[in-house]
């Protein structure tokens, strides 16, 4: 049975048997049999376990992320022409779900998704996280508390996606965010249409464009830092320096020596990496040549880990070449643009011939009648 069929069968079983099936899969995959929703006492216990210094670091980081994302907010567009009103208004989603993966705890995932959701005006946020020894990571619970998220569930894998999408054991969400393993990804893919999803996150990627001015160790450790995410992670060095190429020629790193920085940019556009660092004498001059990248980090002191944690820019990025057609997570991913119009009688009468003729061309008679019947 391939992964698509495997996930489909589990989702079908959960749809049919509901909470009973979720309990069985939670026991099977996570070894957990207790209540799913995290209690107020567990929130309190988690906060008590966090060192004060870590609390301060988390608060400072959240402020930086919030500051960056508040600048993204768009104003509604409204204008009047010929006595008619036209516009585009933005409405936040009411309820979303955030999947925070297990394995290594990733509290930064909750920060990077939860903050823009709150900035956008999302009122209800649900978090799911696979339990470890029957508990959710205390840092995740502390961040949830700071973001005023009260619904956190000890749920992982396919069953967590199903619970959020179908509204089993909780209210259904409108859209699911957050990375996961191949089973979570496939579950998200299959529930798309029932709910929205952010993206299908793949292995981490980094490409570095560097010339002879780049510090060799800076470049090397930036490349290696992304390979640390897992064996499927990818790293490319695109450089005009043979010396740097030789120094960074390590296992897992694809090294490409180019004749010019322009050629490096061309290669980067073909790769469309999740993260692109440009460490050259004049990195800003190359930005206009980059068309495909999830994020661009310039200069010696903007490594990917800085962006992952404390710069405030979002680290939820397209992978697997998807940067050719989509971009970084923003507040707009949590909002819906809605067009609005109120046309005056005078403008309608003067312009309706456009619609009447187009309806005739398309052969849809009742569209035409809807326009003609108005006098």
UniProtKB/Swiss-Prot annotation:
Class in the EC hierarchy, top level: oxidoreductase
SUPFAM superfamilies (UniProt xref): ALDH-like (SSF53720)
Residues annotated as binding NAD(+): 99, 159, 181
GO cellular component: cytoplasm
Catalytic activities: L-histidinol + 2 NAD(+) + H2O = L-histidine + 2 NADH + 3 H(+)
Binding positions for substrate per the UniProt entry: 204, 226, 229, 275, 308, 362, 367
Pathway noted in the entry: Amino-acid biosynthesis; L-histidine biosynthesis; L-histidine from 5-phospho-alpha-D-ribose 1-diphosphate: step 9/9
Swiss-Prot/TrEMBL cofactor(s): Zn(2+)
Active site: 274-275
Cofactor binding note: Binds 1 zinc ion per subunit.
EC number: 1.1.1.23
Annotated positions binding Zn(2+): 226, 229, 308, 367
Purpose of the protein: Catalyzes the sequential NAD-dependent oxidations of L-histidinol to L-histidinaldehyde and then to L-histidine.
Protein family: Belongs to the histidinol dehydrogenase family.
Protein name: Histidinol dehydrogenase
Native species: Pyrococcus furiosus (strain ATCC 43587 / DSM 3638 / JCM 8422 / Vc1)
